């Protein structure tokens, strides 16, 4: 178990490890506001989304029997602001892996361009990230390691930025964004300037298309892709959702070389609730992952003479 904890520590606090730093979600088609500031305010209302993920259920320290499986929780909210010619958004996330905890806050703006029956959002956000580790629960080989000595109980605070562009039409969308673009570094106070954490720039490419087939009355099929990379590793999700009368949905997702996911959900008026279960296909995990998503949209009245742009229901 000490080896596993060492992997967690190095993943979060070493600039030499290649694992991606941004949290992972199966409900990526509902999570544009967290990874792409260009999507802020593109839906017709104030949209609040929450996602909770428990990864590798039942993963415990074999000595203490304490749960060490990663847990991630986030809440995002975005809304159109007419006098700003765009939208604003905020996101709060907490990612916990064994003794390591990350707290992230994002705040940003998106400028909207009307392109016929399409719309393009170009946005940016600033983010503040607090990374902390419970050193009392570690059993390091070398307690004088400068990385560990430089860590305070309050953790380290890192600022960075993200940019993104989100293009949508009534039945499809395509988007590109980059997070942690400044690649901020942090050094330990007692380690002679040795860098023990560095943000790595992440890139996102997403797209989806609503398909209506005459043979399936009331159904809307939405294939989509979600690609994330830090130029060292690549995550690619291929999704297919089927929605019936905008009330219930189900779907499948394949995360290449990692997991197959089953998704179900219901919608009642402006409330949507979804659940997914990841079945691992890699050798890293023997147990699956649970994820719950909830979203509520507060409608905003617009001038009837103004053209509306409502894309896919996943904004």
Residue spans for each PLM region:
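Sec-dependent N-terminal signal peptides
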Residues: 3-13
């Amino acid at each position: 178990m000490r080896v596993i904890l060492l992997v967690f520590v190095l993943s979060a606090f070493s600039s030499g490890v290649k694992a991606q730093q941004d949290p992972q979600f199966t409900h990526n088609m509902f999570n544009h506001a967290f990874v792409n500031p260009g999507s802020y305010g593109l839906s017709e209302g104030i949209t609040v989304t929450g996602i909770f993920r428990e990864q590798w259920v039942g993963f415990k320290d074999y000595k203490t029997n304490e749960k060490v499986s990663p847990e991630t929780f986030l809440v995002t909210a975005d809304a159109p602001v007419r006098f700003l010619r765009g939208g604003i958004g905020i996101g709060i996330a907490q990612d916990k892996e064994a003794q390591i905890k990350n707290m992230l806050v994002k705040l940003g703006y998106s400028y909207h361009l009307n392109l016929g029956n399409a719309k393009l959002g170009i946005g940016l956000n600033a983010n503040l990230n607090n990374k902390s580790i419970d050193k009392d629960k570690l059993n390091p080989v070398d307690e004088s390691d400068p990385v560990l000595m430089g860590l305070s109980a309050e953790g380290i605070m890192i600022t960075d930025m993200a940019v993104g562009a989100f293009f949508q039409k009534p039945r499809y969308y395509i988007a590109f964004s980059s997070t942690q673009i400044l690649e901020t570094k942090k050094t330990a106070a007692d380690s002679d300037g040795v860098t023990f954490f560095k943000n790595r720039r992440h890139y996102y490419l997403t797209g989806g298309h609503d398909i209506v087939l005459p043979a399936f009355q009331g159904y809307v099929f939405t294939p989509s892709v979600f690609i994330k990379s830090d130029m060292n590793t690549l995550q690619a999700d291929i999704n297919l959702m089927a929605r019936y009368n905008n009330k219930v949905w189900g779907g499948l997702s394949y995360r290449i070389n990692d997991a197959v996911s089953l998704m179900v959900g219901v919608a009642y008026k402006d409330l949507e609730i979804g659940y997914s279960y990841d079945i691992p296909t890699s050798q890293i995990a023997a147990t699956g992952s649970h994820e719950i998503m909830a979203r509520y949209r507060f409608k905003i009245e617009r001038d009837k003479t103004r053209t509306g742009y409502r894309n896919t229901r996943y904004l």
